[in-house]
Design a protein with these regions (language model features):
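Hydrophobic alpha-helical targeting segments used for export or membrane insertion
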Residues: 9-15, 139
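A short, acidic, amphipathic alpha-helical segment used as a generic capping/interface helix at domain edges
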Residues: 323-330
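Sec-dependent signal peptide recognition
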Residues: 2-10
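Active-site mouth of glycoside hydrolases
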Residues: 32-299, 309, 334-336, 348-383, ...
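Active-site neighborhood of phospho(di)ester-bond hydrolases with catalytic His/Asp-centered motifs
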Residues: 340-343
């Protein structure tokens, strides 16, 4: 399998670069879309990806994100602790979840990513020992979000180490069929998708958070604090986990909502790490090739977390954020996948600094971007609250740029 992927990556890496066109379809503005969506009982649930046929010589078909039959453009946010911070002392208290959703609705946020699970291995008994209560609580969160007309993107396995540590297995067991880690992956995915698929508030399904950053590390002994190679997580292990997750989601979700990996922006050396265990910088073709490995079918998006204002490629040096986005979107297009910025910005020093990201995303035609992170009590790293000055202008930016998206798409 490794040999196959290396050969396929080599072929993909030599594809020529090209620009990326905006979707030719005129979509509805976000307010119009949500009105059509939330008030329509027969509508297809959630965001989904469709292919727009290519036109013209050498044109590349484009995968676009849709909602209720319209091309979807939006910027939203995160509420990392929406569910996970409600798991307290062996019980579940959803008071803060409801309060958070109330604020997000009041502030006009229409789509939110959240940790649909735990972070630490010690927290897993909330599900393993109290499965029915746990799933019932998730359903309540989804139902309340639907009442608030907020779309949710649940991220299932936020911390790569939690499940393996809980079962006393090496980290590479994410890629080992028959391991207890993969067994949990399969059970949990089926349980959560089955529990939540009936809700219109579920916009998509995401594997987890930035798993690509743990792959093929030349300094794995230092990173994982072990000399045991069974903990040297490989790109193939992550590919297997992503495929397993996505296959279950696709089988259990009759509405075929979009599926996301949850990856960070790929490391500048991600291809070289996979192929030759080195930190050498990838060129643009190698970047496109390794993007394929970390977003396998039936995942139908390419997710990146954009915190930098540019990146390096060996064939063109340090590039601007605008060029970075063009390369990322072209990589997604060559794979017939939609490009999503799953996180961006963090803590910046001014409103203008945030605008640079929003303007770049708008100009590039990125359909979905999610700002990190609203926290009701400000108790998540690099977060903002609704009452602090930064939070007030960030919520204002979300509203402002959604209005710009609406004007761009003709509604």
């Amino acid at each position: 399998m490794k040999r196959f992927f290396r050969s396929a990556l080599l072929l993909l890496s030599v594809l020529s670069t090209a620009g990326c066109n905006r979707p030719s379809d005129k979509g509805a503005g976000i307010s119009d879309l949500q009105t059509r969506y939330w008030n329509n009982e027969s509508v297809r649930k959630g965001l989904y990806v469709k292919n727009v046929p290519a036109t013209g010589v050498n044109a590349v078909s484009e995968a676009v994100i849709c909602l209720a039959g319209w091309v979807y453009h939006a910027t939203g946010g995160h509420c990392y602790g929406l569910f996970s911070y409600c798991l307290k002392d062996g019980g579940i208290d959803l008071t803060d979840a409801y309060a958070s959703l109330d604020i997000l609705k009041e502030q006009g946020v229409g789509v939110v990513r959240f940790n649909c699970g735990v972070f630490y291995s010690e927290e897993l008994p909330a599900y393993t020992d109290h499965r029915d209560d746990y799933l019932a609580a998730l359903r309540k969160v989804a139902a309340y979000a639907q009442q608030c007309e907020i779309g949710l993107i649940p991220s299932f396995f936020w911390n790569y180490s939690a499940v393996s540590l809980y079962y006393g297995e090496p980290y590479r067991c994410w890629g080992k069929a028959g391991s207890r880690t993969v067994g949990f992956l399969m059970r949990y995915t089926e349980d959560v998708v089955t529990a939540l698929r009936e809700y219109k508030s579920i916009f998509g399904w995401e594997f987890g958070n930035e798993l690509n950053l743990q792959a093929d590390l030349p300094n794995w002994q230092e990173r994982f604090d072990t000399e045991d190679p069974a903990n040297w997580t490989k790109g193939d292990d992550i590919h297997f986990a992503f495929r397993t997750f996505a296959d279950i989601v696709r089988a259990k979700d009759p509405d075929s909502r979009m599926i996301l990996s949850g990856n960070a922006t790929l490391r500048p050396s991600q291809y070289h790490q996979y192929v030759e265990n080195s930190w050498d910088t990838d060129d643009t073709g190698q970047y496109r090739a390794i993007t394929n490995l970390f977003n396998p079918y039936p995942i139908n998006t390419v997710t990146e977390h954009v915190y930098e204002t540019g990146r390096k490629f060996s064939d063109c040096g340090k590039v601007s954020l605008d060029r970075q986005l063009r390369e990322a979107m072209y990589a997604a297009r060559t794979l017939n996948k939609a490009y999503v910025v799953g996180e961006f910005a963090g803590v910046l020093q001014s409103e203008e600094a945030y605008r640079k990201y929003y303007d770049a995303f708008l100009d590039a035609g990125v359909q979905l971007t999610l700002l990190w992170n609203f926290a009701l009590r400000g108790d998540v790293e690099h977060s903002f609250t609704a009452t602090e000055p930064r939070g007030q202008y960030l919520f204002g930016l979300i509203r402002e740029y959604n209005e710009k998206y609406a004007r761009e798409t003709g509604k």
